[in-house]
Amino acid sequence: MAELTPMMKQYLEIKRDNPDSILFFRLGDFYEMFADDARLASKELDLTLTSRDKDPNKAPEDKVPMCGVPYHASDAYIARLVAKGYKVAICEQMEDPAKAKGLVKRDIIRVVTPGTVIDAASLEDKSSNYLCGIYLDENAAGAAFCDLSTGEAHLTGFTGPDRVEHVVNELGRFSPAEAVLSPGAAEESTLTQALADKFACRVEKGSAARFSLPEAETHIRTQFGEEALKRLPAGNPAAAMALGGLLNYLYETQKTDLSYINTLDYYEQGRFMELDLTARRNLELTATLRGKEKKGSLLWVLDKTRTPMGGRCLRSWLERPLLSVTAIARRSGAVAALVDNTIAREELIAALSGLGDMERLIGRIVYGTAGGRDLASLRAAIERLPQIHAQLASFSDRKLSELTAQLDLLEDVGARIAAAICDDPPFSVREGGFIRDGFDPEVDRLRHILKGGKGVIVEMESREKERTGIRTLKIGYNKVFGYYIEVSNSFKDQVPETYIRKQTLVNAERYITQELKDLEQEILTASERVVALEYELFTALREEICAAAQRIQRTAAALAEADALASLAAVAVHNGYCRPEVDESGVIEIREGRHPVVERMLRDTLFVPNDTFMGEKQERVAIITGPNMAGKSTYMRQVALIVLMAQIGSFVPASYARIGVVDRIFTRIGASDDLSAGQSTFMVEMTEVADILRHATKHSLLILDEIGRGTSTFDGMSIARAVLEYCADKKLLGAKTLFATHYHELTELENTLEGAVNYNIAVKTKGEDIIFLRKIVPGGADRSYGIEVAKLAGLPEKVLQRARTVLRELEEENGVSYAPPRREEDQVCLSAVAEGEVLDALRRCQTDALSPLEALNLIYEWKRKLSQ
């Protein structure tokens, strides 16, 4: 094998220190990859595989493969690799190759991983990108989360047998892109499987040394200060060790200033409502169950934010509903103030529009990857602050007043950027052209030389003619001698002694002077020098801005919160929501409640509102019967979403709501076979029910849909009844429960089970047709309407006829008389339903926006409904 070149030896040494990363090795204007990295990158990035070895006598397999990307376009390629879960180590030239003596010095400047991405093009504007650190031992667990793009950091810890489940639930809040695991965490299959299957999260297995407590305490003290360390529980170091492991990983991979990560949010159980992954999925808080899309989720309805940071703030509220009645009241009070003052609210929203992402801007500035455009964007945002401050100051609400006080106008920072950076800077700070004219005299002088090099020469030529009296003197240029002074032979006796002869021609002599040599050097190097000087000035300006980083972060946080509050207010007004009363009563009372998402998805029909009452003692458990497709699941989800909305401080889709704080919401809705885990529908269902009964408390809200349907009728009914009795029994659980079932026999429990009450979904039948009225009414359903639903689904008529015959035979065998549907059957007073629909439409009608003709058409439509 041929001896390696010095450059390849250097490459292999650096690669040896970064074996788990794809190494981007800087060579001139390209980042090159070699050997296995080249093969992998060429496949993932569709790059042509070549080789530096041009020896025609070597077989292709003996040549080291190579591929590369232009350095100025590398961000897009790095982003593609990181999005696929790879680590990318960026190896940069640490000195100017033109000035290097021998081999150019190179070193890793950062390692980009899924959890450490800060490039704006690689991130979703309204979603955070978290790196998490998890520590786990036989007694305790800790979970730390950090978004490198904004600097926010969160930390929590757990003890006891359920510590792993709690950590997984926290992962559901943050949806990390990458996890750094302690040895104990890496061995916990429940955790690693959740990271892989539920979050598609890259896992970095750390050593015990990375998570050591002494090192963790040192890192926390350095990064967040002594006070932050003192706030952590001394008796449970797991949280500190999780954060220490995360910080260790950041220091190893980032190799830059991380001082903007300066505020630690430590929280314990009891501060936020805890939601497991099943509840988050079934309630479709941030993405739909099937398409994994934002549209159709609760976030889609509530998010009318005007800034990326406001969108992230609102999303975090949805992920972390509050448990403190006081905190909820303060937030909903701010929303109410915004709802009540239409003009000020709309002016605030207009002022926030297009503000930009100050949180991520200051992150990139401190991190060192910001360009001139980032500084210009920050300046533009700062210029909007006085207007936003004035709008916020017009509200008397306590929460909004606090945000106003938190809003630093940053006039000094904005003025400094405005003075230094031009209005439309180029993309790269390495090419110059972004320092404003007049900011620095030396930059101005060099630019003058660049723009008017010939003019400078002409000025010198005129000056020399006047000084020497040589009328034919001229200054010229050629590639051999550079600039020169040419004097005809008739005047060579007048040449000053300071002129140095350089060349003799037939009719003239050519000279140079020290001044001309200096000027030539300035002209030839002006471009390089002005670019270098501009970068120095940019670096100095960046350091000035970094000194104000915490002020900028506080202001950005206030803006994000104001934006999120304004969004909730705008949605409340537009959708006709009410402010809920939130207390610790244990009561859930909702009048004319609506599903926040379904009502926005309906186009041609009105959503039918429903009432809900669940008391601390009475009506704790609602047994809901009715045909499939009638709306049972929608109703139950509706109640859960209204409770959750109330606990994030939002208004809710109802005419009145009183919500006793709920500590957890559990859902068992629908089921699908988990074939990959070898689990059937029924096994999945029973596992989820077991988890719910093990973790629920009397303060929880349970949404249980069709328990027991995955097995035989009597087994299923027995399990359903036992679960229902367990939920209702205050000595065992006593949780508020919405229990939908197709076992009509369970309706008899209303008479024997304390706190149980029957409800059903009203339907109307005409002949063999069925109409769902979507109305929840007291009492149990008298039949299932299964064949009528099958008809709606489009089963062939022959199948339906045969089904009716079989049903009649089965019911006769069991001593049940078959009663075909009457020609017209109402389970409830239809006029009451129609009146409810009309009243709901009237409440939501924006009369000021209606034309006379539109109003008349509405009246005709309402009259038609009431006459049916």
In which residue ranges do the predicted regions lie?
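Active-site phosphate-binding and catalytic loops of NTP-dependent enzymes
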Residues: 91, 114-123, 257, 393-399, ...
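Intracellular alpha-helical coupling/juxtamembrane segments of multi-pass membrane proteins
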Residues: 328-331, 351, 355, 453, ...
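Amphipathic heptad-repeat alpha-helical coiled-coil/stalk segments that mediate oligomerization
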Residues: 140, 208-221, 273-277, 289, ...
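Conserved catalytic alpha/beta cores of large enzymes that bind or transform nucleotide phosphates
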Residues: 171, 176-185, 191, 515-548, ...
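ATPase nucleotide-binding head domains, primarily ABC-like/P-loop NTPase cores
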Residues: 35-38, 236, 306, 317, ...
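Charged catalytic and DNA/RNA-contacting regions of genome-maintenance
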Residues: 1-337, 353-366, 370-462
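Extended active-site and interfacial segments that coordinate phosphate-rich ligands
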Residues: 38-55, 146-174, 493-524, 604-614, ...
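Short, amphipathic C-terminal "tail helix"
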Residues: 371-374, 847-868
